[in-house]
Every structure is written in structure tokens, then in C-alpha cells.
């Protein structure tokens, strides 16, 4: 008979310790079958109070004693071979387990046990199985000194903290998946809060389609929406600008070619007001993608001049249509953040500093709220922000650590390549594939992993899988988990609130955990719920609703923490206008054939007096 005794004199006896006088058949099981990955244990069910039988339940970890080592297994099935139950005497049961690894005691007396993935000595027939010891369970999830944070407790034993290696979780990207209503947003808020506390140097940009995260991070967050966003049109690449002009519809190749030729001319007019339509070719040549300012009026003027120079009437309808699109977009109140008159000034440093929190002034999180914004605006803006995030991290040489969190990521990176916006997909894919080399990280949150681009999902090295009911979504997660932990995912469709299965680089081994409970005032979307509860039906402001419906909100002054005062009465291109000199002299390597212009200069060169 095997009896676990106290490891040292005076050690307190925990509930897994057994008394030598206890009935072995009520406490222990014996291995009756074993293959390379699984084993079957024969045991007896307790028909008195069920306290011992409760140890043999699905999802529990058990231990098989082999003398010098203890094999750890996860119960994934339990049953009776005869499918009959007797109320008299004891009932023989069979417990199916998946072999996870093995635990061995440390070399020094009193040292912590050590857990190893994989099996070096398999259980023999008749080997004794019992409830895993608390010290062994702690060893299974020990992170071996890696920088870690506590995000909850183990589902099997709430006295044991659930820790993740925060540096590995961030640096190799992570994903949080789960169906609607299981607590994804709350779990993400907890992860972000813990990450900020552990990594004060981290900047976080949240793409928030439901306007809910700002209330969960009030002391860390700066809220940005379409009313307060400053993102001038000249910072958009040609593809991104065309998405706005064509309102998400298929583009006209002839109009795009015209834009590609005329935008550099307008940019040259901004830099050299007296140069006319001449554009010097060479190392200093401007392209449609170069992020330097230009005036919409100059672009429209170039279109008019092009139409006047045409000898054939065939191309005039194309240019006329392009001019109409530009004028329509510039007058659309939904695009006020792009075409605000004062944004003609070169405010790129202030714009980037405010969005990406450089310096952060104690608020390293920017929450970009997108609820109510048209899809073509969301597509273009998300593309610009993702592209800038990567470029900033790249050219900062690792000094700027950025996390881009994508809520409902399947909207930006759908599995179907015909859907979504190609530049956004490309920008996020570049972060997923190369971002960790430069300090730009990706967090993916989705309720439909089956609809997410598998290339993006495959780059996420740590997963937090909450309840998933859809079989296709479950299959995607199963394909990402190690074979030795596949049975853990059998619980995906039945897990409770705040529960998740964590696996990947950020944890020692696959772990079923329960997230910490956040205070009620820090739950995502709390402010909106409180407003809805406090308001009454007769308090509805119909006038305000109609104004929002028409997208003509009252203009509000936008605070730019680092912006200089701009004289809106004088525009770039006016005869008496002089631009402020560039504050930084660019180096000879401003241009990079692979990544484009360095954000430090963005192609700006001081003009000679």
C-alpha cells in the first residue's frame, strides 16, 4: 500500500495527505492501461458522501507515483464499464487521463519540485494514482523565474495563482477568443491593466469598435474619437486616401493614376510655393505616399490645369469625376478630422505624439473609439495607425514599445481575402510577422476565430481561449494547441464566466484559469450602462439624436498638448506665407528602400532662404 507521508518533520497535513488506516480502494486508483499519450485508471466510486469520488472528475489533474518521479495526468473522461450503478457497496469506475508530464523532487532537501514536459518513464500496470499534491501542482505551472504577472487563479485550486510571463506574452503577440458575453472585454481590461503596471514603458493603442475600454482604464487612458481625432489627409498613403474618396467601393484605375501623378505636384507646391507645377526628379523627389503636407485647393487646381491641357475629351470625364469625389469628401462632416483647415500646417510631430503618447504624461493608453464611424473611415484610419505604429517602433530602434490591440479583429483581418481593406490587412500582417523584432506587438481579440486570417492567428504565440460554442471556431483553437494538451479543449463549450484556457509561450503548460474579478466601476462600458439606467424614457433628447444622425455635431475645440498656435488666415502657398524652418536636419539615409521615410523627418528638408 502506498502512503504519502510528510516531507519534513512538522509539515502540516493537507487535504491530499492520506492516513495509513484509510481504505485504499476509496482513495487510490491503479493504472490498467497505458499508451504513448493516455492511460486508464481503475478506481472505486465513493457511495457515502462523494468527497473522494469528486477527485476523479473531468478537468482535474492527478498524479501517478513511480517512485523517483510522479507522472501528471489530466482527467478527460470517466465512466463505468457496465453502465450500471449499485447503491450497495462500491462501484468500480474507469478514469481516462491524458499524460501531461512528470514531476521530480529537487536535488537539495526541501527544494521545490521540478516539472518537465514529456514523459521519460511511463506508468506501469498497477501503478498507484492519487490526487496531485499542491506543491506538485504549483510546479506544473511554475514559470522558472520569468518576469510574470498574476491574472487569476487555477480552476482546480483557487489557492494557487495563475501567472503568465508578461514579456513573452507581449513580445510574441497574444489572442483572446470567446463567444459574446463570456467576459472577453473584462479579461482584456485586466490584462492591459496588469501589463501597464508591470511594463511602465509600454504604450498601448486600442482599436475599440464599441467605445467600452476607456471606462475600464480611466487613470491610464486618453480617449480619441472622430470629434477629437487629428489625422490630416496628407498622412494617408494613396491606397488609404482612395478608400476614403471611393467610400469603400471599387476604385477607378484611371482616377488612381491621375492622383498618383497630381498629388506629388501639390506637395511640391506646398514646399516651394513659387515653383509652379514643376517637380524635380531625383533623391529628393516626392511621391503620392510621402507624408508631407499639401493643400486640397492645390490638388484641385492641378486637376483643372490637367483638364485644360488635354487635347482629347476622353480623359476629361475621369478628371471631372475625381474632382467631384475630392470635393465631396472634403465637405463631408464625417471626414472633418482629415480635412480640418488648420491641419494644412505640418503637425505630424504633434499628431503622432498625441496618438502614440510620446511622451505619455502618465497616460500610456490611447483608446480610439470607432462606434458610429462609417466602415470606409475605419478602414483607412486603422490602416494609417497600424502602419505608423510599426514605422515608429522600427525607427526608434526598440526604444518605443507599442502594443496595438484589435478588438473584433476579424473585421480588419478576415479569412476571406476578398473582404476587408487590403492596406489594413497588410499593415497588421507586417506587425504580426516582424513587429516583435522592433518592439511593436499585436493583441488580437475576436469572437469568431474561424473568420480571422489564419496567417495572423498563427503568429500569436499565447492564447486565452474562453467559451466557444461554434464547432468551426473550436477547430481553429485545437489546431493551435499542442497535441499533449488537446483534451483540455474539450471544455471549451462549457466553461463558465471569467474562465479561460491559456496555452502557448506565455505559460509553462496549458492552464485552465479563472480571471480576477475587476471592481464594478472598472468594468468595460460601465459609464454607458450607468447612463442608460439613470436616464428615463421621457428624458430622450430627440434634437441631439437627429444631429448625430445627420453627422453634423457642433464643432468642438481640439486640445493638442504639443501643438503650436496656427494662423488659419494664412495658408501654405500664399505669396506672403513662410513656413517655419525644419527643426531637425535630416541625415543622408532619410530614404529606406524597404520601409520608406523615417518618421523622424518624414522627408522634411529645410529650405534655403
Which role does the model predict for each range below?
Residues 174, 368, 443:
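Conserved beta-strand position immediately N-terminal to the Walker
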Residues 194-198, 248, 388-394, 424-442, ...:
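Substrate-engagement module of ASCE P-loop NTPases
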Residues 2-177, 397-400, 415:
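Basic- and hydrophobic-enriched, low-structure N-terminal and domain-boundary segments
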Residues 146-231, 502, 533-535, 543:
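Glycine-rich phosphate-binding loop of nucleotide-binding enzymes
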Residues 211-215, 221-222, 233-430:
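P-loop NTPase motor domains
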Residues 247, 429-434, 438-514:
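Conserved ATP-driven motor cores of ASCE-family P-loop NTPases powering translocation/secretion/packaging/pilus
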Residues 497-609:
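Conserved P-loop NTPase motor module
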Residues 256-278, 490-521:
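Conserved AAA+ ATPase small/helical "lid" subdomain
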Amino acid at each position: 500500500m502506498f502512503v504519502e507521508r510528510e516531507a519534513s518533520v512538522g509539515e502540516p497535513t493537507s487535504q491530499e495527505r492520506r492516513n495509513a488506516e484509510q481504505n485504499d480502494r476509496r482513495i487510490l486508483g491503479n493504472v490498467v492501461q497505458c499508451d504513448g499519450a493516455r492511460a486508464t485508471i481503475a478506481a472505486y466510486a465513493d457511495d457515502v458522501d462523494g468527497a473522494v469520488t469528486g477527485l476523479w472528475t473531468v478537468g482535474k489533474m492527478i498524479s501517478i507515483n513511480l517512485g523517483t518521479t510522479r507522472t501528471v495526468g489530466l482527467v478527460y473522461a470517466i465512466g463505468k464499464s457496465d453502465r450500471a450503478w449499485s447503491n450497495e457497496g462500491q462501484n468500480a469506475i474507469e478514469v481516462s487521463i491524458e499524460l501531461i508530464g512528470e514531476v521530480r523532487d529537487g536535488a537539495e532537501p526541501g527544494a521545490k519540485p521540478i516539472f518537465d514536459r514529456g514523459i521519460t518513464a511511463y506508468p506501469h500496470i498497477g501503478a498507484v494514482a492519487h490526487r496531485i499534491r499542491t506543491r506538485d501542482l504549483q510546479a506544473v505551472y511554475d514559470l522558472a523565474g520569468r518576469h510574470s504577472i498574476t491574472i487569476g487563479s487555477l480552476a482546480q485550486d483557487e489557492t494557487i495563482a495563475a501567472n503568465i510571463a508578461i514579456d513573452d506574452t507581449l513580445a510574441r503577440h497574444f489572442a483572446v477568443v470567446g463567444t459574446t458575453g463570456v467576459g472577453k472585454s473584462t479579461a482584456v481590461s485586466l490584462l492591459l491593466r496588469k501589463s501597464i503596471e508591470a511594463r511602465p514603458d509600454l504604450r498601448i493603442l486600442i482599436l475599440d469598435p464599441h467605445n467600452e475600454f476607456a471606462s475600464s482604464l480611466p487613470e491610464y487612458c486618453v480617449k480619441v474619437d472622430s470629434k477629437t481625432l487629428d489625422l490630416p489627409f496628407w498622412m494617408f498613403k494613396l491606397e488609404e486616401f482612395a478608400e476614403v474618396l471611393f467610400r469603400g467601393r471599387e476604385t477607378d484605375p484611371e482616377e488612381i493614376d491621375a492622383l498618383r501623378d497630381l498629388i506629388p505636384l501639390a506637395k511640391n507646391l506646398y514646399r516651394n510655393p513659387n515653383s509652379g507645377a514643376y517637380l524635380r526628379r531625383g533623391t529628393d523627389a516626392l511621391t503620392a505616399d510621402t507624408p508631407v503636407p499639401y493643400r486640397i485647393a492645390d490638388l484641385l487646381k492641378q486637376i483643372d490645369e490637367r483638364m485644360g491641357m488635354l487635347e482629347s475629351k476622353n480623359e476629361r470625364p475621369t478628371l471631372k469625376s475625381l474632382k467631384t469625389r475630392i470635393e465631396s469628401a472634403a465637405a463631408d462632416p464625417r471626414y472633418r478630422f482629415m480635412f480640418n483647415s488648420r491641419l494644412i500646417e505640418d503637425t505630424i510631430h504633434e499628431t503622432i505624439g498625441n496618438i502614440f503618447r510620446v511622451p505619455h504624461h502618465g497616460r500610456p493608453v490611447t483608446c480610439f473609439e470607432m462606434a458610429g464611424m462609417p466602415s470606409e473611415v475605419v478602414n483607412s484610419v486603422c490602416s494609417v495607425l497600424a502602419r505608423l505604429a510599426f514605422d515608429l517602433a522600427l525607427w526608434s530602434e526598440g526604444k518605443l514599445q507599442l502594443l496595438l490591440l484589435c478588438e473584433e479583429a476579424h473585421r480588419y483581418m478576415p479569412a476571406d481575402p476578398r473582404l476587408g481593406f487590403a492596406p489594413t490587412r497588410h499593415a497588421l500582417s507586417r506587425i504580426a510577422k516582424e513587429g516583435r523584432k522592433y518592439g511593436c506587438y499585436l493583441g488580437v481579440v475576436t469572437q469568431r476565430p474561424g473568420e480571422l486570417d489564419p496567417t495572423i492567428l498563427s503568429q500569436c504565440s499565447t492564447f486565452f481561449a474562453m467559451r466557444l460554442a461554434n464547432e468551426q471556431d473550436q477547430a481553429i483553437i485545437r489546431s493551435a494547441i499542442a497535441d499533449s494538451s488537446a483534451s483540455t479543449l474539450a471544455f471549451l463549450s462549457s466553461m463558465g464566466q471569467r474562465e479561460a484556457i491559456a496555452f502557448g509561450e506565455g505559460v509553462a503548460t496549458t492552464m485552465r484559469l479563472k480571471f480576477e474579478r475587476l471592481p464594478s466601476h472598472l468594468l468595460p462600458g460601465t459609464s454607458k450602462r450607468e447612463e442608460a439606467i439613470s436616464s428615463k424614457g421621457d428624458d430622450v433628447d430627440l434634437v441631439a439624436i437627429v444631429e448625430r444622425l445627420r453627422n453634423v455635431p457642433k464643432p468642438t475645440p481640439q486640445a493638442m498638448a504639443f501643438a503650436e498656435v496656427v494662423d488659419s488666415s494664412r495658408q501654405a502657398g500664399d505669396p506672403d506665407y513662410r513656413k517655419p524652418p525644419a527643426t531637425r536636419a535630416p541625415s543622408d539615409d532619410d530614404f529606406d528602400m524597404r520601409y520608406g521615410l523615417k518618421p523622424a523627418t518624414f522627408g522634411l528638408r529645410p529650405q534655403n532662404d
